[in-house]
Amino acid sequence: MQLILLSGGSGKRLWPLSNNARSKQFLPLLEKENGEMESMAQRVVRQAQEANLTNDITLATNASQLDIIQNQLGERVSVVTEPERRDTFPAIALAASYLKLKKKCEDDEVVVIMPCDPYTELEYFHTIARMVECVEKSVADLVLMGIKPTYPSAKYGYVVPFAEGEKYQIVKRFTEKPDVPTAEKLLEEGAYWNGGVFAFRLGYMMQIVRKYMQSENFEDTRARYSEFPKISFDYEVAEKAESVAVVPFNGEWKDLGTWNTLTDELHHASIGNAVMGSHCENTHVINELQLPLYVDGLKDAVVAASPDGIFVCAKKYSEDIKKAVEHLTPRPMYEERRWGTYRVIDDSEYADGNHSLTKSITLKPGKNISYQLHHHRSEVWTFVEGEGIFVLDGEEKHVKAGDTVVIPLEHYHAIKAITQLTFIEVQNGNPLVEEDIERFDYQWKMK
């Protein structure tokens, strides 16, 4: 079977730790049994493999998350990037096309779709295995996981089944995010939460894809991505399907999409360079800054600090953060890339119209930044840790801590780390945008 993990979101509910380039599923805040920290996405991939579900995992995402996925998950997953953010149906249609046209999977291959960030237990993945079994036995064209509700929630859609069955039930109808009184009635009917987990044969999905697009290769499908309707998978596929079954799951399952739910699962009250006084109660502090953070006298609160900003809030109001930060600058102040990380130290505009941006950039040993040039900015790099190989217009030289290099406007350049390499980059120009970059192939000579 093939597992497709959906990774979307713009990262505003867990601001300031999450942003457009580092959504909630990539925050390394969950502690493993050995004490190491991992992200929600890393946890889900690990659990799927520990449950012997499959090693054929494809992650469907947007281009802005590609580097952090490669950094955290490496070769454990294949990645399909959508050209633009649309909705779950086009994302799943593109991923299914990748399996069919790129990986050459057969039509009878079972495909499972699930979010990449549920906080759950191994039994969840054993339930997925039972869903696969239902598809293989042709119980229904489409099989869903039904989460046993713990309370009448207005945040989730509901799946209403016919009479109870031991292993699965035939679906009677769907109800989208009702009000609480309606949710109470749905629970009386034996309804489940729709957890966004679906199983089907690849051929079933490709029949739906071909209603919108006839294509013989994946590259063409991706280029024509905008031809898919901007609609959810639930509306376009699940609610129109003639044969749908649900497999129940009654275990630990949470959406850690808010500060309130996330802090419930943190093993420590403080993470990072933070000190909590003795008068704090049910308060969590996360500090990604190098500056120390001291907190005392807070009750039922969350404090989070990152290069993107500082957040102090009572937990019961923390869900309001999404609307509050919509107007803030879209430039991420911290990003994980395939080669390492960068952190914005200063971003200044001057009276003469010039703009400067200062970053601290760290490369992992053996990794390199692509051979590139910029049309609107010059750069000065000062190396503060490690050693590497710097190239300017095809000329390579060794660099180490204490060295400085100047990169004029429209000159080709790159850097490769020998050891862990950290340098301070000062950009000058206008406009200073990440899109001001042209990348080129380059064969390194020195080692």
What is the role of each PLM region?
Residues 6, 114, 383, 426:
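Catalytic metal- and UDP-sugar-binding loop of GT-A-like glycosyltransferases, i.e.
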Residues 1, 54-55, 75, 107-109, ...:
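Short coil/turn connectors at secondary-structure junctions
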Residues 202-406, 411-417, 431-432, 437-446:
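Left-handed beta-helix
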Residues 11-16, 23, 434:
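Short N-terminal binding/cap micro-motifs at the start of the first secondary-structure element
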Residues 121-225, 245:
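Conserved core of the sugar-phosphate nucleotidyltransferase
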Residues 41, 95, 117, 159, ...:
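Residue-level signal for inorganic ion chemistry
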Residues 424-432:
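C-terminal structural segments of small proteins and small subunits
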Residues 2-5, 15-20, 28-115, 119-125, ...:
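Conserved N-terminal catalytic core of the sugar/cofactor nucleotidyltransferase
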